[in-house]
């Protein structure tokens, strides 16, 4: 599994440039026509896949790792889960908290590294989600281990990230950032993309068993996202502890 550039301090698994990048966009997290439009568009797919795999979220304790402005966190809370969302971008968390107050959706947002939370609350969550986050940290395998530690035995951990191959470079960077302008330029670094085999290996080393994988595709003509068997660019992986 490849890694990103550098962390902001020894022992902290964070690329400060990534935190600053998303902090600069924080005010636009809940604008469905902003740079975060793709996340709003794919969120129903992510939520549906989680529910299809893990069952009803009602009454379950859920952790959303790398929650950003809370798009997925809120939707899981609306589905009945008791949700904690963690992120290291304080500005994004501020927006998430404000939106929660406006929408009346209760989520516990915390600015804490996932590794630190794993030491505090091992084996406490029924569902752990880590979506579109692994490609933005220096040591993704460390995040996978922490997510595994946080899950209860027999429960679920979900990941989504980007495959690493020429097609993903063409679609996720050239196409999405430069041609279609779905994302700001510089959102992704190709070297930080993760092959499914690499993620599966990290999951198994952390005590998680991969149980399923789905691809996510975008049709530029209809401007619609859909789940598919094609995992060559964006993919989601379910694992069980």
Curated annotation (Swiss-Prot):
S-adenosyl-L-methionine binds at residues 46, 66, 87, 131. The keyword rRNA-binding does not apply. GO terms for molecular function: 2-polyprenyl-6-hydroxyphenol methylase activity; 3-demethylubiquinol 3-O-methyltransferase activity; polyprenyldihydroxybenzoate methyltransferase activity. It comes from the Bacteria. Disulfide bonds: none annotated. It comes from Bordetella parapertussis (strain 12822 / ATCC BAA-587 / NCTC 13253). One of its GO terms (biological process) is methylation. This is Ubiquinone biosynthesis O-methyltransferase. SUPFAM superfamilies: S-adenosyl-L-methionine-dependent methyltransferases (SSF53335). Its EC number is 2.1.1.222, 2.1.1.64. O-methyltransferase that catalyzes the 2 O-methylation steps in the ubiquinone biosynthetic pathway. Transmembrane segments: none annotated. Pathway: Cofactor biosynthesis; ubiquinone biosynthesis. Belongs to the methyltransferase superfamily. UbiG/COQ3 family. Keywords: Methyltransferase, S-adenosyl-L-methionine, Transferase, Ubiquinone biosynthesis. InterPro entries: SAM-dependent_MTases_sf, UbiG_MeTrfase. Pfam families: Methyltransf_23 (PF13489).
